[in-house]
Amino acid sequence: IVYMGVSIVWAINCVEGFSIWNRWILIFIAMILSIGFMLKDNHAIKNLIICTIVIATINVLSCIICYYVFDVHISQRNNLKLNGFYGNKNIFAVALLFKLPFLYYAVLRFKKFIRYYSLFLIFAISFCLIILSTRSSFIGLFLQLAVLCFYGVFYQIKSRKLSLIFKHSRLYLLICLVAVSGFVLGDAFIKYNFAHYSKIETNNYSIGARVTSIAEGNSKGRLLIWKNTCEIIKQSPLLGYGVGNHKLAIMKVECAKKHDYIVSDHAHNDFLEMFSELGIFGLLNYVSTYLVFGIMALKQMFRY
């Protein structure tokens, strides 16, 4: 955060730098306050889970209702309107994805209504991720499940009580099955609506189509953005262009290659964007936060 503030000195646009820096400061303060609140209040986790359940319910309802309100079942392209009041569908999908770990925790640590309703929401969110059809959320969901399975196996190996091993193994498997079921039924839902209501000939929004587009590099746009970002990084590798100024720096590369002067707002890769804005020193600082938190998480796992 401090280095971001310093980078404003050499930023292309200082006003934009201050604006983005302010957002990072707010995120940092919110994180500190949240940690302090949870350490002080024993009921904070439960309250957080309840808030997550309420908001997730609203998100799921808004996604499914708006699917028909905006005629997405007729024209799949209209799913761009499914933003859930988050600005766009990609942010909406990420917001749904971020709620899943809290719901996993609720299934593993709570009982009765909270546990079973959290399972339902895991199914519903996986279902909605298919409706939103963002490739990054597909990858994110399966990475989450992979981490959950890894933690589950680790926990079972460390636990010496057979009753606990059976109980928790069943819950981990149930979470994975529910999430995958939501994914599969969501895909069937998309295909059903396409077959009965759509007027176009090709379904580009099923799981198969979206995964194939990743494998075939239909992300050529992303790859081109990363290549252009690497070009501006080479021009200023030490200091970068200042916090929040990636979109301005990349203009000199992308405008020369495009006729419409429409450039990318982001690098679609946090590490490349940090490198372009803060230089090598800022990138190392940013990477170190992941390393520190990763080491702390591993220590916590082995402690208990």
State each model region's role.
Residues 99, 269-270:
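Transmembrane beta-barrel architecture of outer-membrane proteins
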Residues 70-85, 192-213, 217:
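Extracytoplasmic catalytic-loop and juxtamembrane helix elements of membrane-embedded
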Residues 40, 74-78, 157-161, 221, ...:
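Juxtamembrane loop-helix boundary motifs flanking transmembrane segments in multi-pass membrane proteins
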Residues 196, 205-208, 212-264, 271-285:
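TM-adjacent membrane-interface loops and short helices in multi-pass inner/ER membrane proteins
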